[in-house]
Every structure is written in structure tokens, then in C-alpha cells.
Amino acid sequence: IKPEHYMPAFEEGIRQHDAEIAAIIANPEAPTFKNTIEPLEFSGMLLTQVNLIFSSLTEAETNDELQAIAKEISPKLTEHYDNISLNGELFARIKTVYENRDKENLDTEQMKVLENHYKDFVRAGALLSEEDKATLREINN
């Protein structure tokens, strides 16, 4: 893998992740673990892999070219993840599943995954007002 391969890989990972999140939001069925939490759990795999490889490399053996890529991709990743964690439509689906978790007949692992996603979104600002979300976005960038 050469340094010039990273930005296109990051951009494709972001594009795929955006499409996966959009599909979850666009699902016309009532939110369930199967149609909301499960696809959320497995979304963004390419982006995660690219980021893991890139981060490992920059921590182990960095150079000016890799540092320039890191500087360029960092705000894009922050914006991308803010767009997910502060997305009201996505959080509404997660919250519905969370509030109906006792009706879902989830096993222990599924319950833990659901709770983790719900808490992660809350901690990331999903319950903030739109004004406060905008402020948080500014702080994050």
C-alpha cells in the first residue's frame, strides 16, 4: 500500500458508510434490531479497515507524506462521524428499538450491542438541540 492509495480508500469508505446509513434511515419498516441495529453494527467496515491500517502505520513509522494525509483526512472523518452520531432520523430508529427492547426477544449479546449503540449516540450528542449540535460540530472540528 502506497501513501497515494489512502485518500481514495478513505473517500470510498466514507461513501460506502454514508450509503449504508442512508439505507437504514430509508427503511420504511418499523425499526427493529434486525433492520436497524444489526446493519448499523456492520456498517462502515471498509472505512474501519482503512483507518485501522493507516493509524497503525502512522503510529509505527510516520513520515511527512503520511502526516499530510492524516491532517487532510482528520476533519473529514470528524465530519463524517458527526453526521452519523448527530443524525436525528437515525437516532430516532435506534431509540425506538431501545425503548422496545423488551419486546424484541433479544439475547444477551444483542441486548449489549443495542445498549452500546444507544449510549454511544447519547454520549456523542444525539439528544442535544439542533443549536447545541451545531456548537458541538464546531468544537469537534
Residue ranges and their predicted role:
Residues 1-141:
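Zn2+-dependent metallopeptidase catalytic domains
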